[in-house]
């Protein structure tokens, strides 16, 4: 059965052949599992877990202990900024984790044949699907932590059940990451009976619609029946978020997994956290998420009260600036720079508006104006209505450049979204303050084992390898592919190209073939739709404006003569079946009619795919082609290209224009030859390489803040887990006393010491006894002063604890540490955002901006750690025990606010998958209390107003 593997490259072929013996073992076990009763099959899971437990107890106990002790050492080294020790401990920790993973995988490999055989049998019994041998290969590749490239229609959903079940046996939880919420629900529910037959629980996490929603998730439970009439998810029992993550297998989107991670790191109590450690994840359509979506940060934010009228000012100003005369644009990098005349013109216009301070835009106090100007010019030149966004019900909604879907709840960051709102004269929303953020790249690099599935990964193999250390393995199809991919046809302009597209659509539908037409924008899909209407050609349009219906539309796109115009990859994840969606066999007449349609389309040649423009990524083109020819069905594809297409205009059109003129061809005559195709492919490779470099560079920038986040979140976990904070705080107090004593007692002669200043400073922390004053200290040596003050501080600390009670003091320590850490971390994120925005100017000083950013970021982080110590020391003696009635920090409150997924200002075109507005849920552990006014005294006893303290 492996005879057709010879068509694959040597390395891929060897990889596949090496798995043959394992597939044979699974097949040999099939008969023995077929004879098992349902109870005996389910009992296999208990047996597998017991065997794994016995193996782990004998092989991993020592490693687990070493990991725990090394993690504690690393946390201490990070606090004292011992870089050498940190590097050594990180290397040791990485080695230990690799050893642990290796032993776990060895144990899992030992039961893999039996586990896969059990899943295959459970699937056959419950949903009537038996895994093909090539699907077993795909499952093995995923278990090994690699990317399985599988063609459209090869059953990726079913393949995932194999490694998900196997890895769930460890009891650490496994995640299946889908591209949208519908697929997370559909796949978990569809495969639910398979897992249930094996005694394994499966859940699906839903987007939380309100901050108080208690059951935003579902668990597959055959014993539960929904009371909602016609509910398609009748056996999905509502459960809490925590229960969903306690399930053996959890399905969800990247945004939900990511926001839950961020929300957990904002919560005031570990009992409210929902996620377990990130163990094993399978990412469906992994190229979409880790390549197209890689640069998109997940951000939990709250409105910032600054800025407002400036957006309107610059929206009025930018149309009065003339390209070339006032500014120059760089389409490749998507930026605009003022000319010398432009600077003068802008200064004159801003002075007239009364917003510029001083006489020059270069004045430092006018720095915010530069950001507004850049955003206004970007909004004008690079962000076009119905291309990058649509205006719907008074809101700017981003359009995914790859799928054409509307990304509800998503906003451009750094003020760009507000600039577009001002340009389109809709209400300008407030800017936001970031409370927590993580990029998709860094989120998924946290998993101990990561793998993925897609139909198109080979073209991005280098990026997967270098950034994620993931190997791509091409899985053979179950049946040979017979789709015919015709050569590209090149026309002089858009008009001639779309006329040819309409003609080909008409020809194909008259043959009884269904036609799928891919466009790159909503504007193009609607223009083509109008052309088809004028020709009297019936069709359906699938774009971001109708994405609610996309699953139904795509499912029917395979009917004889059906014409579907889709914005790029809208409907991804839903198969196009020849003849239309296959009905059940309950109605014989309907089923026979479908069979007749199915046979008619097969005989006509299958689905024909037309691409109306080459994408910047070959992978996206391949995804469109891949909708045709599924599971050995016949099909064909062709791309139409015009010289004024975006990619042709930016890369390579001059050469092809010369060829057409040399050949003396008119606008209605296309070119179709190998040279043109190679030129196009080379242009795509250059763009892909450029985007790869951008993403790789951004990873290096993101890693700076990522390291900071790891330290802060680890410290936060220690605080919430009940660590010995008293010792930590007393150490901080001792450090402060040592530092201040050294600062105020410089010089050999005690007459030069500033002891009055030392006493004044320490009285700002705690009240010194009357007998400890400057005169008394003048009689002591520097060492004696330090000892006396340290002893006094410890006595005062103990006195406070005796007065308040040990329990209340521990609570006080936790809340002060948490509040200080959270509030200063938010400020640090803002500082780092501003630093990153401005660091590019370092290039003018012949300095590498990345190195400058790393160095400056390190300085800022050390300042953050010192400020945390300073604020804790200066508050711990002054704050009263009333704080026990108000336990949430400002950042913890942000966990109950709406969150947004934002896109960064792109240095190059970036793609994104559909996002949804997400809202966090906070389960309060404190008793209900009277609402506190913003100007009331803070209940923590600090003496400050609530809005200036815990109400920040």
From Swiss-Prot:
The residues that the entry says bind ATP are: 135, 153-157, 575
Residues given in the record as Zn(2+) binding sites: 938, 940, 949-950
- PROSITE patterns, from UniProt? SECA, SECA_MOTOR_DEAD
Q: Where are stretches of biased composition, namely Low complexity?
A: 907-921
Bound how, and how many: what does the cofactor note say?
May bind 1 zinc ion per subunit.
Q: Report the HAMAP family cross-referenced here.
A: SecA
- Could you give the subunit structure recorded for this chain? Monomer and homodimer. Part of the essential Sec protein translocation apparatus which comprises SecA, SecYEG and auxiliary proteins SecDF. Other proteins may also be involved.
| Known function | Part of the Sec protein translocase complex. Interacts with the SecYEG preprotein conducting channel. Has a central role in coupling the hydrolysis of ATP to the transfer of proteins into and across the cell membrane, serving as an ATP-driven molecular motor driving the stepwise translocation of polypeptide chains across the membrane.
Tell me what this protein is called. Answer: Protein translocase subunit SecA
The upper taxonomy is:
Bacteria, Bacillati, Chloroflexota, Dehalococcoidia, Dehalococcoidales
């Amino acid at each position: 059965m492996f005879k057709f593997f010879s068509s694959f490259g040597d390395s891929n072929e060897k990889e596949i052949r090496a798995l043959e013996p394992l597939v044979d073992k699974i097949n040999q076990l099939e008969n023995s599992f077929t004879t098992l009763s349902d109870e005996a099959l389910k009992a296999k899971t208990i047996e597998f877990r017991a065997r794994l437990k016995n193996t782990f107890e004998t092989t991993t106990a020592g490693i687990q202990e070493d990991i725990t002790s090394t993690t504690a050492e690393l946390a201490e080294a990070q606090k004292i900024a011992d870089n050498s020790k940190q590097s050594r401990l990180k290397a040791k920790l990485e080695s230990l984790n690799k050893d642990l993973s290796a032993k776990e995988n060895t144990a899992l490999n030992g039961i893999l044949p039996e586990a896969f055989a059990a899943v295959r049998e459970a699937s056959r019994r419950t949903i009537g699907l038996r895994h093909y041998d090539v699907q077993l290969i795909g499952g093995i590749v995923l278990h090994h932590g690699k990317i399985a490239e599988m063609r459209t229609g090869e059953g990726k959903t079913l393949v995932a059940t194999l490694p998900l079940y196997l890895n769930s046996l460890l009891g650490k939880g496994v995640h299946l990451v889908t591209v949208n919420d519908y697929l997370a629900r559909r796949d978990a529910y569809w495969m639910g009976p398979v897992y249930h037959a094996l005694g394994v629980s499966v859940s699906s996490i839903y987007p939380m619609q309100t901050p108080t929603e208690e059951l935003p998730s579902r668990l597959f439970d055959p014993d539960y029946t929904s009371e909602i009439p016609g509910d398609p998810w009748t056996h999905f029992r509502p459960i809490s978020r925590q229960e969903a993550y306690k399930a053996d297998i959890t399905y969800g989107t990247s945004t939900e997994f990511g926001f839950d991670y961020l929300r957990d790191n904002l919560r005031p109590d570990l009992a409210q956290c929902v996620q377990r450690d990130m163990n094993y994840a399978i990412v469906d359509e992994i190229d979409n998420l880790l390549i197209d979506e890689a640069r998109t940060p997940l951000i939990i934010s709250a409105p910032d009260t600054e800025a407002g009228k400036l957006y309107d000012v610059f929206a009025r100003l930018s149309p009065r600036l003339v390209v070339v005369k006032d500014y120059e644009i760089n389409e490749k990098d998507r930026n605009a720079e003022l000319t010398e005349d432009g600077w003068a013109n802008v200064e004159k216009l801003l002075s007239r508006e009364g917003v510029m301070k001083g006489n020059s835009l270069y004045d430092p106090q006018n720095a915010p104006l530069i950001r507004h100007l850049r955003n206004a010019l970007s909004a004008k030149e690079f962000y076009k209505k119905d291309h990058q966004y649509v205006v719907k019900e008074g809101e700017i909604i981003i359009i995914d450049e790859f799928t054409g879907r509307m990304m509800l709840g998503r906003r451009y960051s750094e003020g760009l979204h507000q600039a577009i709102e001002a340009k389109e004269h809709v209400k300008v929303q407030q800017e936001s303050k970031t409370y927590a953020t993580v990029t998709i790249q860094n989120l998924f690099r946290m998993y101990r084992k990561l793998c993925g599935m897609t139909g198109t990964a080979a073209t991005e193999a280098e990026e997967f390898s270098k950034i994620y250390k993931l190997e791509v393995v091409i899985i053979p199809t179950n049946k040979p592919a017979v789709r015919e991919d015709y050569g590209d046809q090149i026309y002089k302009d858009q008009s001639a190209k779309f006329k040819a597209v309409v003609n080909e659509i008409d020809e194909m539908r008259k043959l009884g073939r269904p036609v799928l037409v891919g466009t790159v924008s909503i504007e193009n899909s609607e223009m083509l739709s109008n052309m088809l209407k004028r020709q009297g050609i019936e069709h359906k349009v699938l774009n971001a404006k109708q994405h609610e219906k996309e699953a139904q539309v795509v499912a029917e796109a395979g009917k004889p003569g059906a014409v579907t115009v889709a914005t790029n990859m809208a409907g991804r994840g839903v198969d196009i079946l020849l003849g239309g969606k296959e009905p059940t066999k309950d109605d014989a007449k309907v089923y026979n009619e479908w069979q007749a349609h199915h046979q008619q389309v097969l005989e006509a040649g299958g689905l024909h795919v037309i691409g109306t423009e080459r994408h910047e990524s070959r992978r996206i083109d391949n995804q469109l082609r891949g909708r045709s020819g599924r599971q050995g069905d016949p099909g064909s594809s062709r791309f139409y290209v015009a010289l004024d297409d975006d990619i042709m205009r930016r890369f390579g059109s001059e050469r092809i224009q010369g060829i057409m003129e040399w050949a003396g061809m008119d606008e209605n005559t296309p070119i179709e030859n190998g040279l043109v195709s190679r030129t196009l492919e080379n242009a795509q490779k250059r763009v892909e390489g450029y985007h790869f470099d951008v993403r790789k560079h951004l990873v290096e920038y993101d890693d700076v803040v990522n390291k900071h986040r790891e330290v802060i979140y680890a410290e936060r976990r220690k605080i919430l887990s009940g660590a010995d904070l008293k010792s930590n705080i007393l150490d901080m107090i001792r450090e402060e006393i040592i530092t201040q004593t050294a600062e105020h007692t410089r010089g050999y002669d005690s007459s030069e010491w500033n002891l009055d200043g030392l006493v004044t400073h320490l009285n700002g922390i705690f009240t010194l006894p009357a007998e400890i004053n400057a005169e008394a200290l003048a009689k002591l040596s520097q060492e004696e002063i330090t000892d006396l003050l340290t002893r006094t501080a410890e006595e005062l600390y103990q006195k406070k604890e005796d007065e308040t009670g040990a329990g209340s003091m521990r609570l006080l320590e936790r809340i002060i540490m948490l509040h200080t850490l959270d509030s200063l971390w938010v400020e640090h994120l803002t500082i780092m955002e501003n630093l990153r925005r401005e660091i590019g100017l370092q290039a003018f000083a012949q300095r590498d901006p990345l190195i400058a950013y790393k160095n400056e970021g390190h300085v800022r982080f050390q300042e953050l750690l010192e400020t945390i110590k300073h604020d804790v020391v200066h508050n711990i003696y002054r704050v009263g025990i009333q704080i026990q009635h108000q336990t949430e920090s400002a950042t913890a409150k942000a966990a109950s606010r709406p969150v947004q997924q934002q896109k960064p200002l792109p240095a190059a075109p970036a793609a994104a998958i559909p996002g949804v507005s997400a809202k966090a849920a906070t389960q309060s552990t404190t008793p209900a209390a009277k609402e506190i006014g913003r100007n009331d005294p803070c209940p923590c006893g600090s003496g400050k107003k609530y809005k200036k303290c815990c109400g920040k």
